[in-house]
């Protein structure tokens, strides 16, 4: 797999996607330009087909956002809306709710109702951890008018975050407004909150329909072309960032793996048995809308274009946060089968199974249809690179992409995909999961806390 190193186009793709095109919010011009570039590069790499699949995306944008103190108008308070924050302009006394744990909310009682509340995103120490989305729901139930959420990262950094649960909730337009402030400004507001100062939160935002653009390319199999595997990753970013790590790294991982496998076929005659599909998604940062549109079109029982399900989806997201350690499955029945294939590579790669439903990347729309889906084992589980602790923020620039490790990803992914493609479809373990099974698992896990770093 030396082609992953000697013929690497990573720096070329990084320059175009991160520096030339830049931010690629789903439904924006940057999203469209990225899709066109990816399609052109897949064609140039010699894949059998490379197309753009457009879809209607329920998107959002914001204008001016501010947190101000009417009695101290010269004081500048950092502000950033949560994604899909509704427009709001409200002034109330400030109420500090700490971490918004149950005992803190109960103790404040009616003071929360109709007030702007200040809450730490970090969970309360020595208590059962719960996601901030659950604490947002608690504050909404208590009648808060708006939340100022304190960013846990230091040094004035702030990253876009989501207000709502992704496991069983579609994109919202009427959720409680949440605006983030920096750790430093949050500490200042905590200091003055004991005096209940007046505070104003203003967000100019709108919801609109636009056109998102997925890319779908394919190398046809030689023995079972009617069945396929799929390698995917989202090419969109949040607003205002080039997304070097999240997810230019995963996008280029898809592109480079496709190029390497295509080159093996054209130069050495080594071709996949089953077809291998390579996709990049728009709208991941907006409730996985691109991957959901693809699954609805290709695999929904009600779709006139329905085709056979992929035998496995492998999702690439934030690859620069750690080197490849293996594959993590959503369902357990493929564990021994995939591990046996990894063992033939003799690189110590391991196959594991998630113990919960994870809706935070583009494998999940496949999971919802009970399709076998997985992601690479990297930062979510062990060994996150500290210098790559960037995703939904301006600092996630081109220099956050780890070029050397991405070459390794492309080589390793090409090897595992080729091995899997040459296993006769009938020899794969049968998938016993149903959509009903998955829905029960989603309901079981919705609102729960699942550590991302363990």
Locate the predicted segments by residue.
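Second-shell loop/turn segments in exported
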Residues: 1-5, 19-29, 81, 94-96, ...
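N-terminal capping segment at the start of a domain
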Residues: 2-29, 45, 159, 166, ...
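Noncatalytic luminal/extracellular "stalk/propeptide" segments of secretory-pathway proteins
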Residues: 7-8, 12-116, 122-123
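Short helix-loop-beta-strand segments that form the rim/entrance of peptidase-like active sites
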Residues: 12, 261-289
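Extracellular/luminal Protease-associated
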Residues: 28, 77-171, 175-177, 242, ...
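Soluble metallo-hydrolase cores and metallopeptidase-like ectodomains found primarily
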Residues: 72, 76-106, 166-244, 256-259, ...
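Metal-dependent peptidase/peptidase-like ectodomains
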Residues: 186, 281-385
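His/Asp/Glu-rich mid-to-C-terminal helical/loop segments that flank catalytic regions of hydrolases
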Residues: 384-454
């Amino acid at each position: 797999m030396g082609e992953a190193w000697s013929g690497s186009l990573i720096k070329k793709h990084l320059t175009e996607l991160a520096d030339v095109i830049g931010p690629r919010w789903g439904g924006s011009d940057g999203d469209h330009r990225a899709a066109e570039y990816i399609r052109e590069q897949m064609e140039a790499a010699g894949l059998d087909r490379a197309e753009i699949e457009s879809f209607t995306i329920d998107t959002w944008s914001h204008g001016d956002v501010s947190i101000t103190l009417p009695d101290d108008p010269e004081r500048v308070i950092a502000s950033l809306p949560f994604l899909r924050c509704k427009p709001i302009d409200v002034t109330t006394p400030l109420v500090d709710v700490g971490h918004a744990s149950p005992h803190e909310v109960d103790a404040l009682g009616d003071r929360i109702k109709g007030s702007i509340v200040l809450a730490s995103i970090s969970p309360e120490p020595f208590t059962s951890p719960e996601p901030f989305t659950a604490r947002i729901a608690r504050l909404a139930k208590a009648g808060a008018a708006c939340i100022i959420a304190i960013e846990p990262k230091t040094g004035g950094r702030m990253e876009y975050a989501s207000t709502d649960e992704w496991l069983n909730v579609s994109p919202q337009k009427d959720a409680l407004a949440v605006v983030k402030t920096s750790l430093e400004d949050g500490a200042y507001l905590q200091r003055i909150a004991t005096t209940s100062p007046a505070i104003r939160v203003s967000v100019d935002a709108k919801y609109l329909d636009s056109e998102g653009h997925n890319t779908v390319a394919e190398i046809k199999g030689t023995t079972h072309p009617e069945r396929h595997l799929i390698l995917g990753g989202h090419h969109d970013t949040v607003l205002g960032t080039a997304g070097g790590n999240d997810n230019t790294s995963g996008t280029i991982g898809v592109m480079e793996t496709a190029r390497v496998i295509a080159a093996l076929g054209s130069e050495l005659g080594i071709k996949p048995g089953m077809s291998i599909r390579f996709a990049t998604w728009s709208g991941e940062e907006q409730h996985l809308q691109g991957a959901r549109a693809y699954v609805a079109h290709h695999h929904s029982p009600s779709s006139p274009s329905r085709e056979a399900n992929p035998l496995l989806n492998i999702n690439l997201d934030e690859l620069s946060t750690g080197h490849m350690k293996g594959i993590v499955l959503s369902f357990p029945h493929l564990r021994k089968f995939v591990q046996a294939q990894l063992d033939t590579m003799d690189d110590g790669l391991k196959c594991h199974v998630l113990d919960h439903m994870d809706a935070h990347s583009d494998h999940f729309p496949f999971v919802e249809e009970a399709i076998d889906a997985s992601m690479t084992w990297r930062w979510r589980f062990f060994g996150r690179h500290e210098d790559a602790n960037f995703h939904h923020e301006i600092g996630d620039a081109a220099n956050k992409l780890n070029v050397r490790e991405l070459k390794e990803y492309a080589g390793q992914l090409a090897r595992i995909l080729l091995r899997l493609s040459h296993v006769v479809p009938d020899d794969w373990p049968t998938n016993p999961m149903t959509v009903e099974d998955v829905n029960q698992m989603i309901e079981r896990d919705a609102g729960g806390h699942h550590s991302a770093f363990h």
